[in-house]
C-alpha cells in the first residue's frame, strides 16, 4: 500500500510524514509513505492525505499551481473513491467555498463554507491554538477503539476558521470554543480533521492507524 502525502508547499509535511511512518510501523501495517509533489504519483496512490496550513485562498492557489494536482486529487478521491484524509486547511478545501480574505472555491465535496470562528466568550482568543476535547456526533471507523471523553478525544488545534457544514450527517465531530466548531467531517471515502493528528499524540496516532486500515 502506498500513501501519498501531497506536497504543495503547505502543511506540517515533515511531522505528518513521520507520524504516518510511525503509525504504520507500530501498527504492523505494510505501507510506503510517499511525500510527493508529483500528480502522477498521487493518481496511482492507494490513499491520499492533503495537509494544509495558513489561508484558504493561498492553499487553494498553491495546490492548483502544482501541474495537474487539483485534478489528480479529484480523480483519486471522487472518480476512484480511494480513501482521502484532509488535515486542517486540507479539510477546509473539501468545502464548497472559503470566505477568508476573498471568496475561493474548494472541491465542493462537503456542503458548506469555511467561515471565521466567532466565540461568544471574549476571553477566547482567535486563532484557537492548543488542546481541546472533541465530541463525536456519530460512529466512524476513523475513531474506532479511541476512548471517548477528554482523555481519549483530546486534539490539537491551530486555526481561525472552520467548515460550517450544512448537512448534519457530514459532521463527524465538533469542539466547543465559545460555540460549536467543526472538528471532523466525513462522507463516503472522504474524511477530514480540523485538528492536527500529527500533533495530537495518542489520539492522532490512533486516528492515523485507523485511516491506514480503513476500507470504505
From Swiss-Prot:
BP GO annotations: L-histidine biosynthetic process
Transmembrane segments: none
A Pfam entry, by short name: GATase
Compartment(s) of residence: Cytoplasm
NCBIfam families reported in the protein's UniProt record: IMP_synth_hisH
HAMAP family noted in UniProt: HisH
Protein name: Imidazole glycerol phosphate synthase subunit HisH
Name of the gene: hisH
Amino acid at each position: 500500500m502506498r500513501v501519498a502525502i501531497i506536497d504543495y508547499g503547505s502543511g506540517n509535511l515533515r511531522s505528518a510524514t513521520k507520524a504516518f511512518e510511525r503509525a504504520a510501523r507500530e501498527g504492523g501495517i505494510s505501507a510506503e509513505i510517499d511525500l510527493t509533489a508529483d500528480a502522477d504519483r498521487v493518481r496511482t496512490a492507494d490513499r491520499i492525505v492533503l495537509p494544509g496550513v495558513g489561508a484558504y485562498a493561498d492553499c487553494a492557489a498553491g495546490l492548483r499551481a502544482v501541474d495537474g494536482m487539483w485534478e489528480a486529487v479529484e480523480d483519486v478521491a471522487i472518480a476512484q473513491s480511494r480513501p482521502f484524509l484532509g488535515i486542517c486547511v486540507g479539510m477546509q478545501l473539501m468545502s464548497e467555498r472559503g470566505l477568508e480574505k476573498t471568496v475561493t472555491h474548494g472541491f465542493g465535496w462537503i456542503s458548506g463554507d469555511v467561515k471565521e470562528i466567532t466565540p461568544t466568550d471574549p476571553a477566547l482568543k482567535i486563532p484557537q491554538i492548543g488542546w481541546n476535547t472533541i465530541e463525536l456526533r456519530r460512529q466512524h471507523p476513523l475513531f474506532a477503539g479511541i476512548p471517548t471523553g477528554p482523555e481519549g478525544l483530546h486534539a490539537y488545534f491551530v486555526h481561525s476558521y472552520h467548515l460550517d457544514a450544512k448537512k448534519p450527517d457530514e459532521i463527524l465531530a465538533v469542539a466547543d470554543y465559545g460555540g460549536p466548531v467543526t472538528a471532523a467531517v466525513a462522507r463516503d471515502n472522504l474524511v477530514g480533521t480540523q485538528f492536527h493528528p500529527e500533533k495530537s499524540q495518542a489520539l492522532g496516532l490512533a486516528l492515523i492507524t485507523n485511516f491506514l486500515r480503513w476500507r470504505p
